[in-house]
């Protein structure tokens, strides 16, 4: 074999590998997202239950499911065929009117299990068509307009530069659970 000169240290090598992996992940996510959006963007179903069998690597299911949920403005169950049913990931979008989508999924008679967080969890269903019917009936009166909880409303004419600068002092505290102020 030939000797190749080492032109990067271990840190540079790790960064290069991680960027390569992230690029591969992004390409797989985006390809699947486009496929599923074209199949589901006109659906009137209250929950998008999407069969990803043969289309998406299971490692990317959660990434694609949350992107679909945000774009479709409805909860998503992105699953693939397994031995006795379908398994995958459940996701609901920020400000979804269903506060605990996992618990609702767990109460569906077609659910084998739903485990994880209220809006991001693993799921297994027996029959996706029966589950789709159940969700449509259960959520028939629910509007999926985003719901924003507010502490107070400020009229535009009452906003000053000093007030904005005061809020800006707290920007490092905004995170999940402590939302940035909406304007």
For the regions a language model picked out, list residue spans one by one.
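A contiguous loop/helix-start segment that scaffolds small-molecule binding in enzyme catalytic cores
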Residues: 141-183
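Hydrophobic helix-and-loop "lid/oligomerization" segment in the mid-to-C-terminal part
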Residues: 1-133, 137-139, 153-158
């Amino acid at each position: 074999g030939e000797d190749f000169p080492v032109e990067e240290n271990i840190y540079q090598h790790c960064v290069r590998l991680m960027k390569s992996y992230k690029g591969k992940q992004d390409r797989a996510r985006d390809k699947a997202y486009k496929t599923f959006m074209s199949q589901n963007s006109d659906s009137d179903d209250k929950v998008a239950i999407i069969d990803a069998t043969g289309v998406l690597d299971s490692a990317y299911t959660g990434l694609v499911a949350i992107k679909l949920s945000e774009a479709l403005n409805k909860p998503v169950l992105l699953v693939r065929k397994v031995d006795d049913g379908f398994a995958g990931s459940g996701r609901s979008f920020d400000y979804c009117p269903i506060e605990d989508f996992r618990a609702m999924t767990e109460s569906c008679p077609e659910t084998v299990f739903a485990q994880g967080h209220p809006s991001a969890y693993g799921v297994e269903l027996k029959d996706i068509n029966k589950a789709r019917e159940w969700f449509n009936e259960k959520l028939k009166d629910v509007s999926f307009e985003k719901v924003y909880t507010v502490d107070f409303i400020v009229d535009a004419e009452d906003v000053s530069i000093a007030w904005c600068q005061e809020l800006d002092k707290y920007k490092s505290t905004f995170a999940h659970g402590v939302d940035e102020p909406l304007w």
